[in-house]
Amino acid sequence: MSVADIRNSAESRMSKSLDTLKVNLSKIRTGRAHAGILDHVQVEYYGSPVPVGQVANLNLVDARTISVQPYEKHMAGPIERAIRDSDLGLNPVSLGDTIRVPMPALTEERRRDLTKVVRSEGEDAKVAVRNLRREANEALKKLVKDKIISEDDERRGQDEVQKLTDRAVADIDKMVTQKEAEIMTV
């Protein structure tokens, strides 16, 4: 394993941590509607749980309402139940074969709670990135110990890994700040 291999491995794993954070932040509800909020809601379809997006067409009616159009009419009831029973705090309204999902306005207290959750997600991502940095630095030290690379190469490798870490942490901070601003916007 070379310095470049260690650097590339650290970079790809850090990028996966950022992707995970992005997914986790997208699940946190703001006051605005977006179809992605229903991505992890599962509905029973012929005996097996499937995401709502696979059994219905999801559209945004306006900034605060999602329209759910089931592909099969008999699925309207189960979809409505699945959305209501999810942990999102949504109250769908059935209009015949279409379901409207209005996004309730967030209270100030709920907004503060959500910003704490966002900060916590960001901190978890930073810890993951720092752990990856530590693993990369340990791998570099092992290469020096095994006399595969020189100490100068190790130092250069550590500098590169540190730059990757700094960039990842800056990206995490930016994502967290954007999400907090989105939540606090009334």
Curated annotation (Swiss-Prot):
It comes from the Bacteria. The keyword Protein biosynthesis applies. Keywords: Cytoplasm, Protein biosynthesis. SUPFAM superfamilies: Ribosome recycling factor, RRF. Pfam families: RRF. GO terms for biological process: cytoplasmic translational termination. InterPro entries: Ribosome_recyc_fac, Ribosome_recyc_fac_dom, RRF_sf. GO terms for molecular function: ribosomal large subunit binding. Belongs to the RRF family. PANTHER family: MITOCHONDRIAL RIBOSOME RECYCLING FACTOR PSEUDO 1 (PTHR20982:SF3), RIBOSOME RECYCLING FACTOR (PTHR20982). Responsible for the release of ribosomes from messenger RNA at the termination of protein biosynthesis. May increase the efficiency of translation by recycling ribosomes from one round of translation to another. This is Ribosome-recycling factor. It comes from Bordetella avium (strain 197N). The lineage of its organism: Bacteria, Pseudomonadati, Pseudomonadota, Betaproteobacteria, Burkholderiales.
